[in-house]
């Protein structure tokens, strides 16, 4: 009896192990980035995280349409990418469309120009944005509007201009690079946090509304990333902040974040927080123990004077 049982268990165990190995292989194949030949639009592509995403998506074989305000800098990115090869991966020379995302009156014409390039868009990645540093008491409402125009109304206008073509094809992927501050708010970031919260809400609604149409929506929320975001941030009077925050200087490498974005896009992730333990804990704390979270933020505000600690 025992011998017969042993004989039966052996093949069963081997079969189980084989099945597990097969499942692992299938999972790896599914996780492998596959953006080859897809038409990918990237806003804010002339610098920072947008530029790194341009490099990463180009290396993966995407047909890029790079967008930004500065044609010269966009062309520099195109020339840089045009001189690179990536083994057997077929790559394409990116094209560019120059416009100011904060000027929503030109976004529709820019979207039409984008669609002319390849006839359609597979993936729209909204990265362009502006940060803010300031005390609410000293911040003019015009500055609040400026941040909202760039970070919220601009991406929304571009999304709504591109969206009908995706609906007609029954295929498309809208991606927005939000922030941990779209989940929680910290002192002296009011305009920025408000714009990112608005973005989170809008694209959550959009995801539900287009789900039955074959479209995908991803909200990706990094923590601090080592770019010039804080240097270029606006202050309460509209002037540039001009300082590299300590938290920004020690933030994540934009190359690594860009690779994570590629992976999330290929896997069609719906909502991803790309941050360390501290910010992630704060997000959960805000939901599960708000009273403590509010005390922590009040304490942080008292230790600051409108500038990064």
From Swiss-Prot:
Keywords: Endoplasmic reticulum, Membrane, NAD, NADP, Oxidoreductase, Signal-anchor, Transmembrane, Transmembrane helix
Location within or outside the cell: Endoplasmic reticulum membrane
Cytoplasmic side: 1-5
Cellular component GO terms, alphabetical: endoplasmic reticulum membrane; membrane
Catalytic machinery residues: 192 (proton acceptor)
Membrane-crossing residue ranges in chain numbering: 6-26
EC number: 1.1.-.-
A GO MF term: oxidoreductase activity
Function statement: Putative oxidoreductase.
Name of protein: Dehydrogenase/reductase SDR family member 7B
The organism of origin for this protein: Danio rerio
Gene (UniProt): dhrs7b
């Amino acid at each position: 009896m025992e011998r017969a049982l042993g004989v039966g268990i052996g093949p069963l165990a081997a079969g189980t192990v084989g099945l597990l190995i097969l499942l692992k292989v299938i999972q790896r194949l599914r996780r492998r980035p596959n953006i080859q030949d897809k038409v990918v639009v990237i806003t804010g592509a002339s610098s920072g995280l947008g530029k790194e995403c341009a490099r990463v998506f180009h290396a993966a074989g995407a047909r890029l349409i790079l967008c930004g305000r500065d044609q010269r800098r966009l062309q520099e990115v195109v020339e840089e990418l045009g001189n690179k090869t990536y083994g057997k991966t077929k790559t394409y020379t990116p094209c560019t469309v120059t416009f100011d995302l904060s000027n929503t009156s030109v976004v529709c014409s820019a979207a039409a120009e984008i669609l002319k390039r390849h006839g359609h868009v597979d993936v729209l990645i909204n990265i362009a944005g502006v940060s803010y540093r300031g005390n609410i008491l000293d911040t003019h409402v015009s500055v609040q509007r400026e941040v909202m125009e760039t970070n919220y109304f601009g991406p929304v206008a571009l999304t709504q201009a591109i969206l009908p073509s995706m609906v007609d094809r029954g295929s498309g992927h809208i991606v927005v690079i939000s922030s941990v501050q779209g989940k929680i708010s910290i002192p002296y970031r009011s305009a920025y946090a408000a714009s990112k919260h608005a973005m989170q809400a809008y694209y959550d609604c959009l995801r539900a509304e287009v789900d039955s149409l074959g479209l995908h929506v991803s909200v990706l929320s990094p923590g601090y990333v080592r770019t010039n975001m804080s240097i270029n941030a606006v202050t309460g009077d509209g002037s540039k902040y001009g300082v590299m925050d300590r938290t920004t200087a020690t933030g994540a490498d934009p190359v690594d974040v860009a690779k994570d974005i590629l992976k999330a896009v290929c896997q069609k992730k719906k909502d991803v927080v790309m941050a360390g333990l501290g910010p992630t804990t704060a997000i959960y704390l805000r939901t599960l123990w708000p009273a403590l979270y509010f005390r922590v933020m009040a304490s942080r505000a008292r230790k600051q004077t409108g500038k990064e600690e």
